[in-house]
Swiss-Prot record:
Listed name of the protein: Golgin subfamily A member 5
GO biological process: Golgi organization; Golgi vesicle transport; retrograde transport, vesicle recycling within Golgi
Bias (Low complexity): 174-201
Organism from which the protein derives: Danio rerio (Zebrafish)
Residue ranges, compositional bias (Polar residues): 95-111, 148-166, 441-450
Length: 760
């Protein structure tokens, strides 16, 4: 709905201009209409005064008709009220009314004034809404001032007729203009939709009335000038006095009727306010008309653009003609000025020639000094290059020495690994022997268990047999005791046998106890053998795991050393290539500088000191300044290259030192594994040992992450060193990023949402 808001804003601006025109008409009554005839260039004042003069001609007839009767004027006032109502409903400020005598009157409000302050609008609203009597006094004062402006002599009756009609026009003008101001005030508070269609009708009627007023201006102006210029005879003074009295009476009737009309207009304004409330409800229906009006507005805009184009073309033609005339007039003065300037230019050229010669001598001296400084700088750079080459050679020798040390350490590590492998094989052999012994002990334990079970079974059988014998003996004894016919000898023999049996029983019990003690001792021995075998197995397993772990650590350390050696070889190769490239580029640049210096020396020696024209001197001076600037830039570039080479050498020294330190730290070997094969080691946890792999412990993980970051940074530095365009691109990107951030921070203003005082 932005287009709808734009249309409403345009309509509101148009109504504001109409209200400001009415306010200027009320606040400035002393403005004379004769100024419109003296200023033909001001189109707005011409249209306004022409419309006012035509309205005076129209109101002259209305005043003559109002002198006939009051009823006729009241009917005219009613007609004006109806037509002002029609203009409010249509949203226009131009009124075309018809008097009872049939004279067609044109709109007199066809003017647009510049925008005034809000104080004038408030005064206008207070003036229109107030019902105080000073309004008529202001109107009478305005009528007297306008009559004085139109009739300075005060003797012609025809000059007074436009005065009365103009005063009446000024009285009736505000009665027409308050209606759009009231509608404007209501439209600000109620709806913007009803003003969209009214803006189009206002523009069309404004353009039509403007064309009509512009077409009628010459006739009305010629008629008014003829009326003002005609001399009146002295004999018609009495008739003019009578006409003046009649006109005064008619003016009094007009004033009273205008007051009545003002009251009626106020009532009509209140009714129009109610109608505006109903128009708000009809805003939805007006949307379709707005769509149709959009097409008409586009057509009108195209027509207006064509008219503006033609006006601009005509104005441009007029401007071209005026400029051509002014150019023709100014050519003579320009020629005179050019003659003076030519004389001054000759003097200035002669002085400039002397200054150029002095400057040439000074530049030659500066150039000789600059060439000497340049040769010194080139010599120092060559010395630094030789020093850098010597340093590179020293670094290469140190690298070869480090490589030989690495080879010796690697051989030592291989020998240690071989000894560890032999110790591992011995430990495995001992482990197999111990396993065999454990199996033998287990077999012995099984055999002893089976023997114990067999002895237990024999003991149980013997117990059963002895119990059976004892039971039979007891039965025999009991049977003998019961027998009374036994002899004493048999009784004595039975007692002896009984004693023997008891003695055997005791012996058997002792044997059983001995066998039980032997079984218990065998059980304890078997348990001791089992526990000893388990402990020995566990210890051998631990020793085997330790040996395997040490072997894996040695393999990992060897792999790390080999990778570090390969990386150092690659870095050394990169450094050698970089030094070779820098050496070649520096040699090429030194040759180029020497060639340029030789060319400049040849030019200076071969240059003939002959009299030459000023153009040649200026060209040579310009060439010398350019060469001097180039030499200065070359010196600055060489200085920056020198600093970069120094920085690169320092970085290479630091890298070599760090590489040596890393290799020394990586060459440490855990010598705890070199002890005797039978030695028992304690499993103490080691967190920061040098022999740990990169994947074991917190220290290994941290060292692995640091090594990856270091490798990435080294490769990035080598890439940036190898490609200068990448360095330039990174620097430009960072500079542009900071510049953009500064621009955004300095130019950013947060949005502030606030209500517009006019309702827009």
């Amino acid at each position: 709905m932005s287009w709808f808001v734009d249309l409403a804003g345009k309509a509101e601006d148009f109504l504001n201009k109409v209200d400001q025109g009415a306010a200027t008409a009320l606040t400035k009554p002393n403005q004379k209409s004769s100024l419109s005839y003296n200023s033909p260039d001001a189109t707005d004042s011409t249209q306004y005064n022409a419309a006012a003069y035509s309205s005076t001609q129209q109101h002259r007839d209305s005043i003559s008709a109002s002198s006939l009767g009051t009823s006729t004027f009241i009917s005219a006032a009613a007609g004006n009220i109806k037509k002002s109502k029609a203009t409010v409903l249509a949203g226009t400020a131009n009124v075309s009314s018809t008097t009872p005598l049939g004279s067609s009157s044109k709109a007199s409000s066809n003017f647009v004034r510049p925008r005034k302050s809000e104080v004038n609008d408030d005064l206008l609203f207070d003036f229109l809404n107030s019902s105080d009597p000073p309004q008529s006094e202001k109107k009478e004062v305005r009528r007297e001032t306008v009559s004085k402006a139109f009739s300075p002599t005060g003797v012609s009756a025809q000059s007074q007729m436009p005065t009365v009609s103009l005063a009446s026009d000024l009285h009736t003008g505000p009665s027409v203009t308050p209606t759009p101001s009231s509608t404007q005030g209501l439209s600000r508070n109620s709806s913007l939709g009803s003003l969209s269609s009214s803006s189009h009708s206002v523009k069309t009627e404004d353009s039509s009335t403007r064309d009509q007023s512009q077409a009628d201006v010459p006739e009305s102006l010629t008629a008014g000038l003829d009326d003002l210029a005609d001399p009146q005879p002295v004999l018609e003074i009495q008739s003019q006095d009578l006409q003046q009295q009649q006109q005064q009476q008619g003016q009094e009737h007009v004033i009273s009727n205008l007051r009545l009309e003002n009251q009626l207009l106020r009532n009509e304004v209140s009714s129009l306010n109610q109608e505006m409330a109903s128009l708000i409800q009809r805003a939805k229906d007006m949307q379709e008309e707005v769509n149709l009006g959009r097409a008409r507005a586009d057509k009108w805009n195209s027509d207006q653009s064509r008219v503006d184009r033609t006006v601009r073309e005509l104005s441009s033609q007029v401007d071209d003609l005026t400029e051509a005339l002014s150019a023709k007039d100014g050519q003579l003065a320009v020629l005179k000025v050019r003659l003076d300037e030519a004389d001054q230019l000759l003097k200035a050229r002669s002085s400039a020639l002397e200054e150029a010669q002095n400057e040439r001598v000074r530049i030659l001296q500066d150039h000789s000094e600059g060439s000497s400084l340049h040769s010194q700088a080139v010599q120092t750079l060559q010395d630094r290059l030789r020093d850098a080459e010597a340093a590179v050679k020293r670094e290469q020798e140190s690298y070869r020495q480090i490589q030989s040390e690495f080879a010796a350490r690697l051989a030592k590590v291989e020998a240690e690994r071989q000894t560890l492998a032999e110790s591992l094989t011995n430990a495995e052999r001992r482990l197999t022997e111990e396993k065999q012994r454990a199996e033998d002990l287990q077999q012995q334990a099984k055999s002893s268990r089976s023997a114990a079970e067999y002895t237990k079974q024999e003991l149980q059988d013997y117990k059963n047999k002895a119990s059976r014998i004892l039971q039979s003996k007891e039965k025999l004894i009991n049977s003998l005791k019961e027998g009374s016919g036994l002899e004493v000898l048999e009784g004595a023999g039975a007692g002896v046998e009984l004693e023997e049996l008891r003695h055997e029983k005791e012996l058997q019990r002792e044997e059983i106890q001995k066998l039980q003690a032997q079984i218990q001792s065998l059980r304890t021995e078997i348990q001791d053998l089992e526990t000893q075998a388990l402990t020995e197995n566990e210890s051998w397993r631990e020793q085997l795991a330790e040996v395997q772990e040490q072997h894996a650590q040695q393999i990992r350390a060897k792999q790390e050393i080999e990778a570090e050696l390969e990386r150092s070889k690659q870095e050394l190769q990169y450094i050698e290539e970089e030094h070779h490239r820098t050496k070649i580029t520096l040699q090429g640049r030194v040759k180029d500088r020497e060639d340029e210096i030789q060319k400049l020396r040849n030019q200076l020696t071969n240059k003939a000191l002959s009299n030459s024209s000023q153009a040649e001197l200026e060209g040579r001076l310009h060439q010398l300044t350019e060469t001097l600037i180039q030499k200065q830039t070359m010196l600055e570039a060489l200085g920056t290259e020198k600093n970069s080479l120094v920085f690169q050498l320092e970085r290479l020294e630091q890298q070599l030192k760090s590489l040596q330190g890393g290799q020394n730290s990586a060459s440490h070997i855990n010598m705890a594994a070199m002890e005797g094969p039978g030695a028992r080691q304690r499993n103490t946890p080691i967190l920061f040992s040098d022999g740990d792999g990169p994947g074991t412990g917190v220290y290994g993980k941290v060292r692995k992450a640091a090594s990856t970051i270091d490798r990435f940074s080294i490769r990035l530095g080598i890439f940036l060193r190898r490609y200068p365009m990448a360095r330039v691109f990174v620097i430009i990107y960072m500079a542009l990023l900071h510049l953009w951030v500064m621009i955004v921070l300095l130019t950013y203003t947060p949005e502030m949402h606030h209500s517009h005082p006019d309702g827009r």
